[in-house]
Amino acid sequence: MKKVERFEVPRTIIFGPGALEKTPEVIPPSGRVLIITGKSSTRKYAERVAELLKQNCEIISYDQVELEKPGFDLVIGIGGGRPLDMAKVYSYIHKKPFVAIPTSASHDGIASPYVSFSLTQRFSKYGKISSSPVAIIADTSIILSAPSRLLKAGIGDLLGKIIAVRDWQLAHRLKGEEYSEYAAHLSLTSYKIAVGNAQKIKNFIREEDVRVLVKALIGCGVAMGIAGSSRPCSGSEHLFAHAIEVRVEKEDEVVHGELVALGTIIMAYLHGINWRRIKRIADIIGLPTSLRQANIDVDLALEALTTAHTLRPDRYTILGDGLSREAAKRALEDVELI
């Protein structure tokens, strides 16, 4: 007899220009509301939401959140990855509903139940943090005003889905890991949307361009909710990105989606996938297609490639038990990243 499955996915998703003004239609009277936002530029959106809700709202920057402080009935994350992730952590700890209001679209965290690798490590005492947003409000006019580099990084994150699914299939065949055809299909559909629209949306000058990106990223979040893990959207390409992120002094030195795109090129080569096509798509979008363009030292990339498999020992990927330094260097040379 198969086990009972439980999916946690967003109940309400609204997106489009001016969607922020629809917030009261999505969030009914909820008691005390904690609004977690960025340090500066996104605070004005938090203030507007508080004004619209006409409720007892407390606005706080993501780096000032007191995670153990109770007393809120709803948590809203407004901003990029960090405010949304901290809202998920608070929601998970206190078992309160969480609403995501992204102001950028640089990765699939806008709809995912899960937080970044660094926060997973930092807050490991709380267990496997998972909090699917009950609602997502994506105002495309606001997201369109985000730096184009971050929006392009969102496409970079989507490119990685082909590797994540291939790694998942490999783990299913070789290790007997549970596999969801439905979740994998959703993730691959998001990848296909990115590839199929790359030329058209690459400059992100139209609301429609952002709409395509947001839809694809939300699809990834739903895929993870169905799978009950980040498996359909995070494989060896993400392990490579994480291995670099944990080694840089400041998080702002690198952009997650750009690293994922580079990792996708490398892992496509290892999988025997057409890495040249992926690299061409990345180039069309304007993503870095070499270590130099991404301002990544060769030794750092080699160290990341040879240790990435150790970051999540429970997650089998094409990296297996790890690459030797010689194999890692050959891969970087063959895909012309160096």
UniProtKB/Swiss-Prot annotation:
Substrate binds at residues 108, 157, 242. Its EC number is 1.1.1.261. One of its GO terms (biological process) is phospholipid biosynthetic process. Binds 1 zinc ion per subunit. InterPro entries: G1P_dehydrogenase_arc, G1PDH, Glycerol_DH. NAD(+) binds at residues 81-85, 103-106, 112. One of its GO terms (molecular function) is metal ion binding. It catalyses: sn-glycerol 1-phosphate + NAD(+) = dihydroxyacetone phosphate + NADH + H(+); sn-glycerol 1-phosphate + NADP(+) = dihydroxyacetone phosphate + NADPH + H(+). It is found in: Cytoplasm. Pathway: Membrane lipid metabolism; glycerophospholipid metabolism. Its cofactor is Zn(2+). Disulfide bonds: none annotated. This is Glycerol-1-phosphate dehydrogenase [NAD(P)+]. It comes from Pyrobaculum calidifontis (strain DSM 21063 / JCM 11548 / VA1). The lineage of its organism: Archaea, Thermoproteota, Thermoprotei, Thermoproteales, Thermoproteaceae.
